[in-house]
């Protein structure tokens, strides 16, 4: 099993119908199951994906004229060997105060019917490699204490719990840092099997 991470800001990287179908499959479970989609989270039709979502993904990747509180971010689609969109992951290239507190550098989601197959770990590992290649030294990843699968994924990729803070809504958020390899330290290795 493997995945290929493709940047969603590249024209034609992922078909808009595939993205829309992914959004629908995530939302069929619950309204907030489409985390890790960045600006695509707000799309409620195929037309919105085309006219708003993907252009906004490209704008965030360029860092052009971002609204207050937004940072440059790269959006990736995780495709299995058959080309099925199994997950999405976003790498935020900087942290605002809010992201530093409870948002982090990385957000991800896995298609509901593809969970518990190791995709989240593969996606996070690939995203961490991209972050290191961009010169990032460490990244912050957060999750809810009740999201045991995400916690295991973060730990499997080297996450170290710093603390637990309340979100704006008062819900606890676990904050994990992952140190990234530099040229002198070599490759980071996974500590556990993917979940």
Q: PLM features: what roles do these ranges have?
A:
Residues 131-142:
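Conserved GNAT acetyl-CoA-binding A-motif
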Residues 141-151:
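Conserved beta-strand-loop-alpha-helix junction that forms the acyl-donor binding cleft
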Residues 1-105, 112, 130, 169-195:
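GNAT-family acyltransferases
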Residues 142, 155-175:
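Conserved catalytic-core motifs of GNAT/GCN5-like acyltransferases
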Residues 107-110, 116-133, 152-156:
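Conserved acetyl-CoA-binding loop-helix of GNAT-fold acetyltransferases
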């Amino acid at each position: 099993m493997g995945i290929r991470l493709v940047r969603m800001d590249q024209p034609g990287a992922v078909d808009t119908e595939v993205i829309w179908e992914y959004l629908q499959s995530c939302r069929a479970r619950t309204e907030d199951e489409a985390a890790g989609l960045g600006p695509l989270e707000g799309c409620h039709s195929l037309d919105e994906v085309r006219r708003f979502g993907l252009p906004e993904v490209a704008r965030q990747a360029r860092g052009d004229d971002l609204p207050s509180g937004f940072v440059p971010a790269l959006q990736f689609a995780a495709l299995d060997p058959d080309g099925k969109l199994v997950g999405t992951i976003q790498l935020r290239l900087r942290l605002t105060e809010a992201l530093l507190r409870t948002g982090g550098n990385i957000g991800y989601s896995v298609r509901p019917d593809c969970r518990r197959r190791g995709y989240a770990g593969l996606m996070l590992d690939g995203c961490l490699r991209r972050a290191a290649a961009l010169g990032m030294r460490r990244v912050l990843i957060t999750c809810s204490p009740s999201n045991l699968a995400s916690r295991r994924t973060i730990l499997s990729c080297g996450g170290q719990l710093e603390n637990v803070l309340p979100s704006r809504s008062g819900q606890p958020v676990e904050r994990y840092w992952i140190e990234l390899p530099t040229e002198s330290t070599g490759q980071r290795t996974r500590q556990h099997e993917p979940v």
